[in-house]
Regions:
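Active-site entrance/lid segments in N-terminal catalytic domains of soluble metabolic enzymes
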Residues: 1-204
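Active-site/ligand-binding-proximal alpha/beta "capping" segment
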Residues: 190-226
Length: 229
């Protein structure tokens, strides 16, 4: 499968979803320019996700990517939150700003409730971070005809993702910004640079590999393509 079959785009470029700092506007611009625009949904409630998808579909007929987290939520720890607020208080005071720290997690893992909200859109492409949703939920998403990819930060994670039936693997090198998509290990010593990771993964999996991390110009894109991504 080549990139056009996987992405449905003019160029082999996926815009990295940046939760908390971008809206649908960037996704629309990238899709219109010939790449695959991405909407980060990990910090949005279902109402906001629906509104953003409707904005995208009302602005472009090009393919787009919905990105979701698949992490396990930790129990809310009030004592830990108090420590954080007290630690940060001097900085808020220095900036003459109100303390506005939300209670509970602002990062919501993919769920059947979210699937209920987006199913009517039959999204063409969904990417996951921190592994994959459980098997019945993944099967549900794939039943829509949606292409599914997820991030791997090690060769072992890439092999596991392929065994679960993903259509592509995002090889997230150590240079990548934002959340590290580690899910089979939490040891930072296992993390590889992009060139090393892509070189290993393309030799061991049969699905398309998408390179991610520190790619900032056409030379970087060409280098990743030459590696087999």
């Amino acid at each position: 499968m080549n990139y056009r079959e996987l992405l449905g785009t003019d160029f082999p470029i996926i815009q990295a979803p940046m939760a908390g700092v971008q809206s649908s506007a960037l996704a629309i611009a990238v899709s219109e320019a010939g790449g695959l625009g991405s909407l980060p949904c990990g910090m949005l409630n279902t109402e906001k996700i629906i509104n953003e998808i409707e904005t995208i579909k009302g602005s472009t007929s090009k393919p787009y990517n919905l990105n979701f987290f698949c992490h396990n939520l930790r129990p809310y720890d009030e004592n830990r939150q108090v420590i954080w607020r007290n630690t940060l208080q001097p900085y808020f005071a220095e900036l003459d700003s109100e303390v506005n720290l939300s209670l509970g997690s602002t990062r919501v893992p993919f769920s059947h409730d979210i699937a209920d909200a987006i199913e009517r859109f039959s999204p063409e492409f969904i990417s996951f971070h921190f592994g994959l949703p459980n098997k019945d939920l993944l099967k549900r998403v794939k039943s829509w005809g949606t292409k599914v990819v997820s991030s791997a930060t090690t060769l072992e994670e890439a092999i596991w993702l392929e065994s679960q039936g993903v259509h592509g693997i995002i090889a997230q090198g150590l240079e990548a910004g934002g959340h590290r998509g580690m899910f089979l290990t939490d040891k930072i010593s296992t993390q590889l640079g992009l060139v090393s990771l892509v070189s290993q993964v393309v030799k061991q999996v049969k699905v398309p590999v998408i390179a991610a991390g520190g790619i900032s110009d056409n030379n970087g894109v060409r280098a990743c393509l030459q590696l087999g991504a």
